[in-house]
Amino acid sequence: MWSPNIKFRNEDITNLLGTKVVKLGAAMVPEGRRVFKHLSVDENIRVGSITRQDGSQSIRGDHRKMYDHFPILKNVAHRLAGYCSGGEQQMIAIARALMASPKMLMLDEPSLGLAPLLVREIFEKVSNINQEMDTTILVVEQNAKIALEVSSYAYIMESGKIVLEGKSDELRNNPDVKEFYMGITQGGGRKSFKEVKSYKRRKRWM
């Protein structure tokens, strides 16, 4: 029986406690944001640094950076996180994870439940963080269009299996990916997922 392992920075983290994984440099923003609703926005952000041991000066510097990346949170810093909008809560969750000073930030469905304009704003901020903080970012996302726009490399999964992978710009221009995952036909028009014949879908990944 095959037993999968998860390795990060050459260390097996399969059975490690979450706190130890964070100390190794991996942080995660779970699906649905999951902020501490009874804490203020600022308290939520600060709690992300609880595993750090690099000194208060460095932590204070990163704390200031979070408000530079997400200036809208400055205006609600003392508000209970539970009373914030979905977009604000997503920003809080990302800022909280970044306060752990991760080498890799993992985002699970960051667009879930957000309006299209907010989705684009969140992904633009994530892209900026990737460039400015030199942080590797791994995103699990069903919105293929925007995910392929901001990423450098992508994997397409179906039923838990990787069926296609490659550079994002190449996948973005792949006719099959455009038609099925982005609803764009070869003629440039948009196409509903319901209009894509299932036999074509099966044939592509065989």
For each feature predicted by the language model, list its residue ranges.
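Helical segment within the ABC ATPase nucleotide-binding domain
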Residues: 120-134
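Short, glycine/charged-rich "phosphate-handling" switch motifs in NTP-dependent
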Residues: 153, 165
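ABC ATPase nucleotide-binding domains
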Residues: 184-206
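Conserved ABC ATPase signature
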Residues: 80-84, 88
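A short, proline-enriched helix->beta-strand linker immediately N-terminal to the Walker B motif
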Residues: 99-103
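ABC-type ATPase nucleotide-binding domains, specifically the catalytic core motifs of the NBD
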Residues: 16-18, 39-41, 46-59, 69-71, ...
